[in-house]
């Protein structure tokens, strides 16, 4: 019951923030989620005997999200005002800035490690701290970028639905008929039957959403969640995409999501904990809820930049 109640509260809030929050507020909300997830991640690594430099990590998470917000902001100027190649140059510069942030964080953490006793903990503690940046910060930071175009929120929702539906299918099919363990050392409850059901469910949901994307778009518009059409607006982002590409996208997102789930399970099992936290009744912690999304978001970006870009009009302009 707690699981259903928590989902009933969170899902509408996520959709509302995704479609209605201004870019700065949406980025701030995602940053808040990243901080909560990082806090839980540090709890897991502490349970494994490490002593992360949490305060340093939060500082560089903030710097990373500031850079990603600037990237999303200048990208939005390009899409709205037609700034042309200027935004591309700024985007490349800001992406280089993320690399500089990572390099600076690594050096700062290594310097901080000199105060560790014993000194043999300096490198491990610095390493597990640095990992929070790409694992949580940079991945969640893709959300504001993917949301920038007029169809961006719809694309992010599409991606999230693929992750959620695959997760639900894996859970119930695995419980009902699962017999062959997928990764017994990492997550004894996961089965091959559940994993296959998750892939098939994602492919089916991807095709269904593709088939009914226009009525879904009209529904979102009527609920004032999506902007009314304009001369730059295309209501169906995948309407001309071949079916094989839609299926490939859904399966790729699903496989990445399952890998993300397994990675977090490995971290928790190594620490001897069941959940990353207790913030979400019936669901565990924040990291437990976004672990799959952390791996799925980069795949979503790759498809936009490569395979789906030409069919997603605002990204290819």
Residue ranges and their predicted role:
Residues 304-317:
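Juxtamembrane boundary at the C-terminal end of a transmembrane helix
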Residues 251-259, 286-294:
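Hydrophobic transmembrane alpha-helical segments of multi-pass transport and channel proteins
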Residues 175-176, 267-271, 294, 298-299:
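Re-entrant/interfacial helical elements at transmembrane boundaries that shape
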Residues 289-305:
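Final/C-terminal transmembrane alpha-helix of multipass membrane proteins
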Residues 1-252, 315:
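Membrane-embedded alpha-helical bundles of polytopic integral membrane proteins
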Residues 269-292:
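Interfacial loop-to-transmembrane junctions
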Residues 8-9, 277, 294-295:
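Hydrophobic alpha-helical transmembrane segments of integral membrane proteins
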Residues 165-175, 257-269:
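Short helical (or helix-break) motifs at transmembrane helix termini and adjacent helical loops
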